[in-house]
């Protein structure tokens, strides 16, 4: 399993604009190898808002299949250009090495 994060710096007070885009079912849920998605808002930032989109995949190839799909291109087309509230973003890939579950789930 891998986790891919997209951490985005957003003008202060506008983090909700990006968060709202993910608060509905989309095409990613239909993709092969997709395991889940979380939207995280960093606490206590001063100069900007920071939103991290964290997705879980069976394998990196599954994530790459998503990024090459027409559904991905449609979702990221930014008609009218990149939103002006986005300052910067960074993509990171993580190999999951250990997963722990609550005791009730482990039994």
From Swiss-Prot:
Residues engaged in binding heme: 76
InterPro entries: ABM_dom (IPR007138), Dimeric_a/b-barrel (IPR011008), Heme-degrading_MO (IPR050404), IsdG (IPR023953)
Purpose: Allows bacterial pathogens to use the host heme as an iron source. Catalyzes the oxidative degradation of the heme macrocyclic porphyrin ring to the biliverdin in the presence of a suitable electron donor such as ascorbate or NADPH--cytochrome P450 reductase, with subsequent release of free iron.
Site (Transition state stabilizer): 66
PROSITE patterns per record: ABM (PS51725)
One of the record's GO molecular function terms: heme binding
Keyword terms of this UniProt record: Cytoplasm, Heme, Iron, Metal-binding, Monooxygenase, Oxidoreductase
Superkingdom per UniProt: Bacteria
Keyword Aminoacyl-tRNA synthetase: no
Residues engaged in binding Fe cation: 6
Protein's UniProt name: Heme-degrading monooxygenase
Domain ABM residues, every copy: 2-94
GO biological processes: heme catabolic process; iron import into cell
Family affiliation: Belongs to the antibiotic biosynthesis monooxygenase family. Heme-degrading monooxygenase IsdG subfamily.
HAMAP family the record matches: Heme_degrading_monooxygenase
Keyword NAD part of the UniProt annotation: no
One matching Pfam family: ABM
């Amino acid at each position: 399993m891998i986790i891919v994060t997209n951490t985005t710096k957003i003008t202060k007070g506008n983090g909700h604009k990006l968060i709202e885009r993910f608060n509905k079912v989309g095409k990613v849920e239909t993709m092969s190898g997709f395991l889940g998605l979380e939207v995280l808002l960093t606490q206590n930032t001063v100069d900007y808002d920071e939103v991290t989109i964290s997705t879980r995949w069976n394998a990196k190839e599954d994530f790459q299949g998503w990024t090459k799909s027409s559904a991905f291109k449609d979702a990221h087309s930014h008609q009218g250009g990149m939103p002006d509230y986005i300052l910067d973003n960074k993509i990171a890939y993580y190999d999951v090495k250990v997963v722990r579950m609550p005791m009730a789930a482990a039994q």
